[in-house]
């Protein structure tokens, strides 16, 4: 059974990495990032449900 020839692997891996870097570098450098991202204020809304004030088997409103 012949041995696997790994003598060209270094050159292959190096050329693939160089090619990927060359192809992806312009895409990454052209990407625009926002200068100062600010969080959006969130507003909570009260839900009006019929069981908020009505008596049910699991809820008795405080009087």
From Swiss-Prot:
The keyword Mitochondrion applies. GO terms for biological process: proton motive force-driven ATP synthesis. Coiled coil: none annotated. It is found in: Mitochondrion membrane. Belongs to the ATPase protein 8 family. PANTHER family: ATP SYNTHASE PROTEIN 8. This is ATP synthase F(0) complex subunit 8. It comes from Physeter macrocephalus (Sperm whale). The lineage of its organism: Eukaryota, Metazoa, Chordata, Craniata, Vertebrata. The gene is MT-ATP8.
